[in-house]
């Protein structure tokens, strides 16, 4: 498996790393089977979060006996010092470990710093001094916050969305991390399911000093990435042309499915409904036109234009308008 150095952490992780958000949706035994198969076939880095319901618990169940052979990162979305320590204690308990390799602030709206009044970064330092965490990281979807974190010198890793749909500013962020020796952990490498050719995604990311974490829920998905261990895809003219075609279709105002607009006070499944037009055209067999799918989309009519989703969107999308456009397009598929 190809490897990458995570900046000044000096941790060496595989270009195939495990994103454990999707294992929330499967049983403990199914998750354990996937996690162990990944480890047995060369995965050494596993990423989760306190917000991912029982993901940490499943990871601890599956990997506790090989703890010293793997790298674990998790996250806290706490906004208070009390919440920080509560999250950390719970994560350590669920993961069945006494330390976390990389502890990350989970998509904060600002860049926590020393002396900012929140006490959050001071708590990180204290946790590190106590040996409960080894490296300090941050995850974000906002370019300005990410850039500030990298330039601050306070963070050893940055986790940020990066795929072959990346803008020039996103690519510049990768270079900024390299200049500051900050490890770049790449999330949303398949753009929330909109990218369906993982070989092209892998080949594109292999050009950069980034560590992709692939969200894996099914064994066939894992097998697909494992096939790249011995035969890693690389960029060629055909893949470059395919990426250019994809960029023309997917660049611009589209929902990435990050879910930071959720929950909706009216019960609208925003992070699915707001990108339904693309899902219908890119995964037509996924049952989007079922009775359940139609009922989900019909909830868009209940939108009261409160603006909460628009204010929360890290990509600055006009979410209410995007929902309405997607619903109008959806109706054309029902005729």
Name each region found by the language model.
Residues 1-70:
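N-terminal binding-site loop/beta-alpha segment at the start of enzyme catalytic domains
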Residues 19, 49, 103-106, 139, ...:
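Conserved residues at the C-terminal ends of beta-strands
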């Amino acid at each position: 498996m190809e490897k990458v150095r995570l900046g000044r952490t000096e941790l060496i992780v595989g270009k195939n790393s495990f994103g454990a958000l999707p294992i929330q949706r499967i049983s403990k035994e199914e998750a354990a089977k996937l996690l162990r198969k990944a480890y047995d076939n060369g995965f050494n880095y596993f990423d989760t979060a306190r917000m991912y319901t029982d993901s940490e618990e499943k990871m601890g169940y599956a990997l506790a006996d090989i703890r010293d052979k793997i790298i674990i990162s998790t996250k806290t979305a706490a906004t208070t010092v009390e919440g920080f320590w509560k999250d950390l204690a719970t994560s350590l308990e669920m993961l069945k470990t006494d330390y976390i390799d990389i502890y990350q602030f989970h998509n904060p709206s600002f860049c926590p710093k020393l002396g900012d009044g929140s006490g959050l970064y001071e708590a990180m330092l204290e946790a590190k001094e106590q040996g409960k965490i080894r490296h300090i990281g941050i995850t974000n979807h906002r370019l300005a916050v990410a850039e500030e974190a990298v330039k601050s010198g306070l963070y050893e890793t940055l986790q940020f969305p990066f795929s072959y749909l990346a803008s020039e500013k996103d690519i510049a962020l990768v270079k900024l991390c390299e200049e500051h020796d900050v490890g770049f952990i790449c999330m949303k490498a398949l753009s929330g399911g909109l990218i369906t050719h993982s070989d092209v995604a892998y080949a594109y990311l292999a050009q950069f000093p980034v560590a992709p974490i692939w969200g894996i829920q099914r064994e066939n998905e894992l097998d697909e990435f494992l096939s790249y261990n011995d035969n890693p895809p690389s960029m060629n003219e055909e893949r470059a042309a395919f990426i250019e075609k994809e960029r023309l279709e997917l660049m611009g105002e589209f929902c990435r499915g990050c879910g930071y607009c959720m929950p909706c006070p009216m019960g609208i499944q925003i992070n699915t409904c707001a990108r339904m037009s693309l899902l219908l055209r890119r995964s037509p067999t996924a049952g989007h036109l079922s009775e359940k799918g139609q009922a989900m989309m019909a909830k868009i009519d209940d939108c009261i234009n409160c603006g909460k989703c628009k204010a929360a969107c890290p990509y600055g999308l006009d979410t209410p308008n995007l929902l309405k456009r997607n619903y109008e397009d959806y109706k054309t598929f029902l005729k």
